[in-house]
Design a protein with these regions (language model features):
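Hydrophobic alpha-helical segments, principally membrane-spanning helices and signal/leader peptides
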Residues: 5, 21-22, 61-62
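Charged, compositionally biased N-terminal leader segments and the immediate start
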Residues: 1-14
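Polar low-complexity intrinsically disordered regions
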Residues: 1, 19-21, 46
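Conserved ATP-binding subdomain of kinase catalytic cores across diverse folds
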Residues: 29-32, 38-134
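N-terminal alpha-helical transmembrane segments of multi-pass membrane transport
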Residues: 13-17, 21, 27-35, 39
Length: 134
């Protein structure tokens, strides 16, 4: 699929304690619900020659762009007044998409399955809350 991805992944330069290389868990018969065409234009991506079935495979993580090295990230922060070790428990980063070789945009699949940072969940995400994020 040629849509204009230009991936880099500077996160791979971090010590291995900060990242886990992991592939998204496949989804059975994915469907495309919405495509943000304005964002695609801003990112210089062209989806016009790809049908919705192939886009669903791409955005579900069933098919990955060839120049990606997918990772989950470890991080920490304060949650409810306490320092907490956190991480991408249900998200996989494809990489940093470069626009005009100057701007970097993290491309991440949320709800793409368990990672070693998942606590007790299955790593999936319910559609409603994900749509509120856009």
């Amino acid at each position: 699929m040629t849509i204009g991805w230009h991936f880099d992944n500077t996160y791979l330069e971090l010590p291995k304690t900060f990242i886990e290389e992991i592939k998204p868990t496949p989804v059975h018969d994915p469907n495309l619900v919405i495509l943000n065409k304005e964002l695609a234009r801003d990112l210089k991506l062209d989806f016009s020659n790809i049908d919705n079935k192939d886009l669903a495979k791409l955005f579900s993580g069933n098919v990955l762009p060839s120049d990606t090295c997918t990772i989950a990230q470890a991080y920490a922060g304060h949650q409810f007044g306490h320092f907490t070790m956190l991480g991408d428990g249900r998200a996989v980063l494809l990489g940093e998409h470069l626009v005009n070789n100057t701007k970097r945009f993290d491309i991440q699949f949320k709800g793409s399955g368990r990672t070693s940072f998942s606590r007790s969940g299955d790593g999936r995400a319910v559609l409603g809350p994900m749509l509120r994020n856009i």
